[in-house]
Amino acid sequence: MTNRPPSAYRTNVGLMLIAADRRVFVGQRARQPDAWQMPQGGIDRGETPLEAAGRELWEEVGTAKALLLRESREWIAYDVPEEQRPSHWRGRWRGQAQKWFALAFTGNDSDIDVDAHDREFTAWRWV
């Protein structure tokens, strides 16, 4: 088990938001309309992975109506090809190390508002 992320990777959280009928939330990426994904985002300085998960849920999905089911035990690291690395990384990272969170959605569809904050997603659905 790895409790600390590898140093050459940007720390990040991923969220699997699960509805009562066991479908999973996915959002259509604002900057890549052909791409649909689960919410994810970086961990801010001084923030725990769980705190980052709550913040990302609020910023990207527009809700806080969820209960924690499980957190991944290990950091899951992957490399990003050099030509696809964002310029704002400025060579600091070779990829991302993620902690994943399974969350039970406790609200109604009307409690989701992807337009509320960051506008990472232009549309959403349960799959």
Predicted regions and their residues:
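Conserved N-terminal beta-strand and adjoining loop/helix that marks the start
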Residues: 2-24, 42-45
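Short connector loops at helix/strand junctions that flank enzyme active sites
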Residues: 10, 33, 38, 94-100
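Short loop segments at secondary-structure junctions
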Residues: 19-22, 30, 104-109
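Surface-exposed, flexible loop/turn segments at secondary-structure boundaries
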Residues: 23, 32, 74-76
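Unchanged
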Residues: 43-127
